[in-house]
Curated annotation (Swiss-Prot):
Location(s), subcellular: Cytoplasm
Pathway(s) of this molecule: Amino-acid biosynthesis; L-histidine biosynthesis; L-histidine from 5-phospho-alpha-D-ribose 1-diphosphate: step 4/9
GO CC field: cytoplasm
Biological processes per GO annotation: L-histidine biosynthetic process; L-tryptophan biosynthetic process
Catalytic activity entry: 1-(5-phospho-beta-D-ribosyl)-5-[(5-phospho-beta-D-ribosylamino)methylideneamino]imidazole-4-carboxamide = 5-[(5-phospho-1-deoxy-D-ribulos-1-ylimino)methylamino]-1-(5-phospho-beta-D-ribosyl)imidazole-4-carboxamide
Highest taxon listed in the record's lineage: Bacteria
Identification of the protein by name: 1-(5-phosphoribosyl)-5-[(5-phosphoribosylamino)methylideneamino] imidazole-4-carboxamide isomerase
Recorded name of the encoding gene: hisA
Keyword annotations from UniProtKB, A to Z: Amino-acid biosynthesis, Cytoplasm, Histidine biosynthesis, Isomerase
Gene3D superfamilies: Aldolase class I
The protein's Enzyme Commission number: 5.3.1.16
One GO MF term: 1-(5-phosphoribosyl)-5-[(5-phosphoribosylamino)methylideneamino]imidazole-4-carboxamide isomerase activity
Family in the record: Belongs to the HisA/HisF family.
């Protein structure tokens, strides 16, 4: 079980949102490079970078992500608006260990299969979830797709993992959706990483007990509610 700090990018800065709502931005830090370095120095051995602007189609942070990847002291997974093969290739060329694909991987089964086979072991499929339904396009659209059905459809693909975000709990620091995460872990053939509401070491232990491979953490780390050094000592590697 590994703890993975999130570096969410918006307008060239590091931010944290509440409940997946772009109007509720609770954290904004001007220097994402410094933020990422601090997480590495604290003892975390993996990083999660998301381009929120690209996810919503309102811009992109490609040059900043390239700089973050080249500067990083630890393996990095990158997502947000990754919807074509050339972007996957560019991210890997720039140094991403894994690429997180969401909206197009949900909506286009043929593309999902083609990309997974073209980049075996390098793709993490994101299932952003609200009320057990998969949401897409930067959490703006809710599909009719049940998350368990979706995760089961990924079984034959050579993935690096599945990232499940409980969007309804994102940034609220009220704990994560344990029943959801447990059900996804049971349904998945691949390592499952939880995101959304993970706030305490108790949350981490509960996820570990339910078979999760790791968790992406944001608000609890940025606000100091969760002791970053202690978390890194227990779940940094």
């Amino acid at each position: 079980m590994i703890a993975i700090p999130a570096v969410d990018l918006r307008g060239g800065q590091c931010v944290q949102l509440v409940g997946g709502d772009y109007e509720q931005e609770q954290v904004r830090l001007a220097d994402p490079l410094s933020v990422a370095r601090d997480w590495s120095r604290t003892g975390f051995t993996r990083m999660h970078i998301v381009d929120l602007d690209a996810a919503t189609g309102r811009g992109q942070n490609h040059e900043l992500i390239r700089d973050l990847l080249r500067d990083s002291m630890v393996p990095v997974q990158v997502g947000g608006g990754v919807r074509d093969e050339s972007r996957i290739e560019r991210l890997i060329d720039d140094g991403a260990e894994w690429v997180v694909v969401g909206t197009r991987a949900v909506e286009d089964e043929d593309w999902r299969e083609e990309m997974a086979n073209r980049f075996p072991g390098r793709l993490i499929v994101a299932a952003d979830v609200r009320e057990r339904r998969v949401v897409t396009r930067g959490w703006a659209e809710t599909s009719r797709l049940d998350v368990i059905d979706f995760v089961e459809s990924l079984r034959t693909l050579p993935l690096a993992g599945v990232l499940v975000t409980a969007v309804h709990l994102e940034g609220l620091m009220q704990g994560t959706d344990l029943p959801l995460m447990e059900d996804v872990a049971e349904a998945s053939a691949w390592p499952v990483y939880a995101s959304g509401g993970v706030t305490s070491l108790e949350d981490m232990r509960a996820l570990e007990h339910r078979g999760l491979a790791g968790a992406v953490l944001g608000m609890a780390l940025y606000t100091g509610v969760l002791d970053a050094r202690r978390l890194a000592e227990e779940y940094g590697a």
